[in-house]
């Protein structure tokens, strides 16, 4: 086991250490001045049950960052284990919704019909967090579908295998 102090000289190692934490995979969507936008995100977590709050963190360097920060509403879609290609697609292209059946929810937010869970949110607050923004959303509606989640760890997609 190695140890280091996070610094620009150790940025790659710091990122590698963060990648050891296995997460689920989400796609965040919103309406923007130029049309619907999306972004694959694994920086998603619950904040509060009462009121129902969640957060996610877009990078400042993302060309979609400013549009998401300006959005009054957004949706977070938790992907199913068979949606790896969808995760890859929206990691690279945030405006092409051709691979998915899309409906529009309140405030014209684009919604995926096929996902494990969907959280429709109003933007509650946005904080600066280093090279990312921390977007906190108040959850207005939840849609839940049974199934298994898509997982992500150390730069690779996979599946979660529960232990009995």
Locate each region found by the language model.
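Basic, polyanion-binding surface patches
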Residues: 1-164
């Amino acid at each position: 086991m190695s140890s280091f102090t996070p610094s620009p000289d150790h940025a790659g190692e710091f990122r590698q250490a963060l990648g050891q934490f296995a997460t689920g995979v989400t796609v965040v969507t919103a309406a923007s001045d130029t049309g619907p936008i999306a972004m694959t995100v694994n920086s998603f977590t619950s904040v509060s049950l009462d009121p129902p709050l969640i957060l996610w963190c877009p990078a400042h360097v993302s060309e979609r960052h400013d549009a998401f920060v300006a959005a009054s509403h957004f949706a977070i879609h938790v992907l199913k284990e068979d949606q790896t290609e969808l995760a890859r697609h929206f990691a690279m292209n945030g405006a092409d919704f051709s691979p998915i059946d899309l409906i529009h929810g309140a405030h014209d937010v684009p919604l995926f019909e096929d996902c494990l869970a969907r959280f429709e949110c109003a933007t509650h607050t946005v904080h600066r967090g280093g090279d990312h923004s921390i977007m906190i959303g108040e959850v207005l509606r939840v849609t839940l579908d049974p199934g298994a989640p898509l997982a992500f760890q150390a730069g690779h997609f996979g599946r979660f295998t529960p232990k009995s």
